[in-house]
A protein has these predicted regions:
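Conserved active-site tyrosine of GNAT-family acetyltransferases
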Residues: 16-21, 79, 106
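Short hydrophobic/aromatic beta-strand element in the GNAT-like acyltransferase core
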Residues: 40, 66, 98-101
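N-terminal beta-strand motif that seeds the catalytic metal site of vicinal oxygen chelate
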Residues: 1-17, 63-65
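Short alpha-helical
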Residues: 14-15, 73-74, 97
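Conserved short beta-strand elements that form part of the metal-binding/catalytic scaffold
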Residues: 26-61, 103-104, 108-114
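Vicinal oxygen chelate
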Residues: 1-4, 8, 29-30, 80-114
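Mid-chain, well-packed structural core segment of small domains
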Residues: 61-88
Length: 114
């Protein structure tokens, strides 16, 4: 199981990026519209870290892991069969791939197919 994308939603994306750059030695780029204007950095293992502010008033700060999967539809079906509640079904994001979010035991988990 590999984390493809680590999403950090916070109130001050610039401050969060600066802290992550200082502590972890990564470098964040400009906001990416397809990813909710998240600023993206690539970790040493090739996984992506995205930092953005909430997209809606109801959205709260959160850190969400998106696990890489080969088949997003199958992974969503398996998550649901395991008792997960699908929050967002498979959704295409520009050229970045397909993602989905499900809840399990109060935790939000993401799936990502490149």
């Amino acid at each position: 199981m590999r984390i493809h994308y680590l999403e950090i939603v916070c109130s001050d994306a610039d401050a969060q990026c600066a802290a992550l750059e200082q502590v972890h030695g990564v470098s964040f780029g400009s906001p990416v519209a397809d990813l909710g204007n998240a600023r993206i950095a690539e970790a040493s293992d090739g996984s992506l870290i995205g930092v953005r502010v909430p997209l809606a008033e109801h959205e709260q700060p959160i850190v969400r892991n998106y696990y890489e999967v080969d088949d997003i539809v199958k992974a969503v079906e398996e998550a649901e069969a395991a008792g997960g509640v699908i929050a967002f079904g498979p959704t295409r994001i520009g050229d970045t791939g397909n993602w989905a979010i499900y809840f399990f035991d109060g935790i939000q988990l993401g799936l990502w197919q490149r």
